[in-house]
Amino acid sequence: MSTNKKQKCKQINKCARIFSVIICFTTLIFAQYQIGYYSTIFQDPDRSNRNIETKIYYPATIIDDSTVTAIGQFPVIVFGHGFLMSWDTYQNVWEEFVPEGYIMVFPTTEGGLFSTDHQQFGWDLQFLVTKIQNEGLNNNSPIYNSVDNNTALMGHSMGGGAAFLAADSLCNSGNNHLKTIIGLAPAESSSNGVSSIASALNITVPALILSGSQDGVTPPTDHHIPIYNNLSSNCKTFISISGGGHCYFANPNIFCDIAESSASNGISISRIEQQSISFDFLNLWLDYTLKRDCSYFSVFQDSLFNSNSITFDQLCLQNPTANIIENEGVLTSSIIGTGYQWYLDNSIIPYANEISYSPNIDGHYNVEVFFLSGCPTISNSYNFIIDLGVLEKFIPINHAIYQNYPN
């Protein structure tokens, strides 16, 4: 190839890469949703019709200057506020996640100075995990037909601790909505005879805890780390933001900031920096656990190992990979999962979604196994050749197979 042609090809390739970046960037911009909002009061019949005022933010679009619910179904994040911190202190949180395609649910209960009941707040969060599913079935609701099954519990400080109380009950009852729990500087809720640290023992869903290294309000060694250590999740991650504080996960709040100024020392990053670091990890984690996109887990892992802004601890057990077992012409996955997909020569076999599959042609077969949490795994290829001896068992006795010789 001539030098001019090589240079021309390089220019074309460079332009193609730039064009691809522009297209991707443009797609990301237009993929962002507007934010819809409404407030409602739910009643919990199991607690004497306790009133639970709830603020709900949801993905929306603007049509003719009116805000309407975006088309689609969106995962849910139920969020618990901190002690003496109103739900609107977390405007930074809903403005981050709702445009990315999440419904955010904020109970406003248990905001008093002397009457705060951590157990009741935990029950409020627990109640909303299932109640919001009913809201999606209510044709008078702004989020009618918009609620996805997958749900996260998330909370800050007191609300973080209460989220672990809620997850304890949900995991024990076998709730199938809760897919992950996230604590932002979660506080040990030891009042009212409960304990977030103790509750962590019963939590099995994937978990993520973010902590500021300089948090003096809920010191990590007394609060965040014991909760993390007690978790029974098969995938859990603890992230310590270097130089971070307790209150910087939220917007300014006079009560939290006064406590921080008297209890925390050595905070060396800004509120904006701490939130930026947090959102980088949270977006990846939520896309992995709630949107079930396993490619984001790989990016999450890369960020953990390459970030200079954090230190971390992690225990994540990988889901097992199946072997294919053949018995009399039937292929079976060696691993039991929640779902299956069989492949022939790297192509999906329609309706082949059971633990076993009976092939009728030669080829290379794989089985993909799905699990309650974590990523699916796919087996090594199995070369299947039809055994005529086995095939004869399925031929009626008054039929036979003959070689078709040419005349």
Model region roles, listed by residue range:
Residues 74, 81-85:
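Active-site glycine-rich loops that stabilize anionic/oxyanionic intermediates
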Residues 88-107:
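Short amphipathic alpha-helix adjacent to the substrate-entry channel of hydrolases
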Residues 341-360:
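Surface-exposed, flexible coil segments in extracellular/virion-facing regions
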Residues 175-249:
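The feature captures the conserved acid-bearing segment of alpha/beta-hydrolase catalytic domains
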Residues 67-73, 117-161, 168-173:
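Gly/Ser-rich "nucleophile elbow"/oxyanion-hole loop immediately N-terminal to the catalytic nucleophile
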Residues 243-245, 252-319:
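Alpha/beta-hydrolase-fold serine-hydrolase catalytic core, especially in secreted/extracellular enzymes
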Residues 323-329, 344, 391-407:
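Surface-exposed, proline-anchored Ser/Thr-rich loop/turn motifs
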